């Protein structure tokens, strides 16, 4: 009986801690990144910055998005591999 009471109290305590932590952290990112038109506007971390391929670089076409700076990847022969315009 004592063990059951201890387990119930422990579960209630841990649940209360989780709910409190979740409520306090809502809408409070430490370093929010604002993305607009596919580009990172504020990023101190170089890994988060968007990199694009220059004209003439090899790219993968046909995926609905392009990693080319111009936004256009010209597909050669329908293979899905092309070059940035």
Curated annotation (Swiss-Prot):
What does the tissue specificity note say? Expressed by the venom duct.
InterPro entries, alphabetized: Conotoxin (IPR004214)
- Major location category of this protein: secreted
Give the keywords, sorted.
Answer: Cleavage on pair of basic residues, Disulfide bond, Knottin, Neurotoxin, Secreted, Signal, Toxin
Disulphide-bonded residues: 52-69, 59-73, 68-84
Q: Does the keyword Coiled coil belong to this entry?
A: no
The terms under GO molecular function for this entry are:
ion channel inhibitor activity; toxin activity
Q: Which residues form the propeptide?
A: 23-49
Signal sequence interval, chain numbering: 1-22
Q: What family does the Swiss-Prot or TrEMBL record give for this protein? A: Belongs to the conotoxin O1 superfamily.
Q: Please give the record's comment on domains.
A: The presence of a 'disulfide through disulfide knot' structurally defines this protein as a knottin.
- The molecule here is called Conotoxin MaIr94
Name the species this protein comes from: Conus marmoreus (Marble cone)
